[in-house]
Amino acid sequence: MLPVVALIGRTNVGKSTLFNYLTRTRDALVADFPGLTRDRQYGRVQRGERDYFVVDTGGIIEAAEGIDDQAMKQVDHVLDEADVILFLVDVHAGMTAGDELIADRLRRINKPVLLVANKIDGTQALIAGAEFHAFGLGEPLLISAAHGTGVHALLERVEALLPESGETGETEAEGGIRIAVVGRPNVGKSTLVNRILGEERVVVYDQPGTTRDSIYIPFERRGERYTLIDTAGIRRRARVNEGVEKFSVIKSFQAIEKAHVVIYLVDASEGLTDQDANLLGMVLEIGRGLLIGFNKWDGLEPEQREKVKRQIDVKLPFLEFAKKYFISALHGTGVGVLMDAVKPIYQSAMLDLSASRLTQVLQDCLTAHPPPLVRGRRIKLKYAHQGGHNPPVVVIHGNQTEDLPAAYRRYLGNEFRNAFKLQGVPLKLVFKSAENPFQGRRNELTERQIRKRRRMIRHVKKR
């Protein structure tokens, strides 16, 4: 599971500014979920070899300004979920009663806490951070989130404290094909999980996976071993208070990251929402095999069904590779067909692609449709090899590949997909250009060449 970094602090200390700085400068994606919150509060950060989630808990701590017990319980839930906590304070405002209350709670937990003194612009840094030593949380890290001052050093400290993302509480090799059931609240995730397990009539048990309480449910189907990653129950508990509600999104992300295949469930009676499209975009970016189940299909009138199918064409054009199934989790209609598709998708995700076959497919593509000219020169694509699994990654080497148009990249992706009969998985293409050995080098003239050049210049001037 990917680790979680939580930003804690009072209102207007710069949590959102720091969050925006981190997500603006990361190498991967940020997920926005307008259906859950009006603010950008959930981000996935990839920096070098480190990969983790960052959460702006602004709304939680703002609720705590009243210093009531219920608000502090929400803070406690945040602290339980996070691996590293960044406690932000405002050097201009100095120490406040709200800061002291939060610091008192942080001193009692057994988790890494970094004290971050923000807004050091226009102040003497050492003097600005001095008073915060009184919190007893170590040396304050002085930053300006607005301008990025000190943020690089802060991230180095954070990443040194994070657990490795591969550390989990269950043995991956023993679980078979891992399936994550993901979707918005109340779309029937728990019903689908119970239907899948009930159909097979096997004895199952809840195996706690990590400290984040994802539930791993092993079962067998037609002699094949599977593990359901069930996050459905997590979201039910999320209704209790806002603190857990926010982290339910992170739990969904972690379930997607852990899975081989994702079953994304949509409530067909409500149609496709923007939140559905955002979550599906996350699955695509992470690169997992995907099945989309439209639940409660049996309760729709014919005109409603046509409306949903039109929505699929309009809102999900980027998921042409994903199979869509129209099911009823409650009555079991279509669930068997849905499960039959899981194994072929897993096999596509883990397929070994030989370099010779990939290069042959590439050459066939070039023969049928050569790359376009760029600045009068044709882009050269030379050979291809596999770069990874789940999702399948194809690395293509050539010259000027950075100038290859998006349309031609899509053409290559479709041809590779068809050639290897990949089902239900995104295919990632990585283009690499050969390095120019002379780039950045200047020809150093000898003394003799310099004297000759000067004579030539004088000769030209005399003429």
Swiss-Prot record:
Any one Gene Ontology biological process term?
ribosome biogenesis
* Binding locations of GTP 1: 9-16, 56-60, 118-121
Query: Its Gene Ontology molecular function terms?
Result: GTP binding; ribosome binding
Domain of life assignment:
Bacteria
Record-linked NCBIfam families: GTPase_EngA, small_GTP
This protein's assembly is summarised as: Associates with the 50S ribosomal subunit.
Quote the function comment for this protein: GTPase that plays an essential role in the late steps of ribosome biogenesis.
Protein name as it appears in the record: GTPase Der
